[in-house]
Design a protein with these regions (language model features):
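Conserved nucleotide-cofactor-binding alpha/beta core module
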Residues: 1-104
Length: 104
């Protein structure tokens, strides 16, 4: 989950990792909030995900409900305490295992 699935250091750091995950062992859902910049980084992430959900400006509750409905086991929030963060989604506990990583 991130507002930075675009031309941004977060996307540049996670894209190749996501592209090389073993899909026989996991399914990748990416939840984007914030606006798309249409960059090649955004396009690569859209292609790399099994499910790419553009949540736009939806509320924390709506995003948490979608994540829960998708039966996500591990949720990693990539924004931390940066602009556009949605740490409030984690407070709603939409996944049994949750972490905040990479953003500060």
């Amino acid at each position: 989950m991130s507002a930075d699935f675009k031309f941004h250091p977060v996307a540049q750091l996670v894209t190749e990792f996501i592209e090389h995950l073993d899909r026989t062992r996991c399914k990748v859902h990416l939840y984007a909030h914030g606006r798309s910049d249409g960059s090649s980084w955004r396009q690569r992430l859209e292609r790399a995900a099994d499910v790419f959900a553009d949540m736009g400006d939806e509320s924390d509750g709506v995003i948490a409900h979608r994540i829960s409905a998708d039966d996500v086991d591990v949720l990693i929030e990539l924004g931390g305490h940066t602009r556009g963060t949605r740490l409030g989604v984690l407070a709603l506990r939409p996944a049994p295992v949750q972490a905040s990583y990479l953003g500060y």
